[in-house]
């Protein structure tokens, strides 16, 4: 699986992200590093992954609901297929937990 052209830079980024989250500065760091459009794209990818893992809608329906392209949905679907199943189970648990919290559960 392709992760980055420069693993050293990628690992430095991950270390910086870990420190930001540990110190409660994730919002500021991501605002510094990502444009508003990039932040929106990441948030959209989370919604795509959530919908794909939920398996209650066809990809075309997800595309229409999220107002995005078929290619964007396909990229999300393809990444899900190559990730370890245990990791995807964890992601699904996290997304389900977040959705319950948003709906007033937990």
UniProtKB/Swiss-Prot annotation:
Residue ranges for the DNA-binding region feature of this UniProt entry: 59-82
Pfam hit, one: Trp_repressor
GO biological process, one term: negative regulation of DNA-templated transcription
Gene Ontology cellular component terms for the protein in this record: cytoplasm
Signal peptide: none
Domain of life, per lineage: Bacteria
GO MF: DNA-binding transcription factor activity; sequence-specific DNA binding
InterPro entries on file: Trp_repress, Trp_repress_bac, Trp_repressor/repl_initiator, TrpR-like_sf
Role played: This protein is an aporepressor. When complexed with L-tryptophan it binds the operator region of the trp operon and prevents the initiation of transcription.
Quaternary structure note: Homodimer.
Matching HAMAP family: Trp_repressor (MF_00475)
Family: Belongs to the TrpR family.
Protein name: Trp operon repressor homolog
Source taxonomy: Bacteria, Pseudomonadati, Pseudomonadota, Gammaproteobacteria, Pasteurellales
């Amino acid at each position: 699986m392709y992760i980055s052209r420069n693993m050293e830079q990628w690992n430095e980024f991950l270390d910086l992200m870990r420190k930001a989250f540990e110190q409660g500065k994730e919002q500021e760091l991501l605002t510094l590093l990502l444009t508003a459009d990039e932040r929106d794209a990441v948030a959209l990818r989370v919604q795509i992954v959530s919908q794909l893992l939920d398996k209650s809608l066809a990809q075309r329906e997800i595309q229409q609901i999220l107002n995005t392209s078929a290619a964007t949905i396909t990229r999300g679907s393809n990444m899900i297929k190559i990730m370890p199943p245990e990791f995807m189970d964890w992601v699904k648990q996290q997304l389900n937990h977040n959705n319950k919290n948003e709906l007033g559960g937990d």
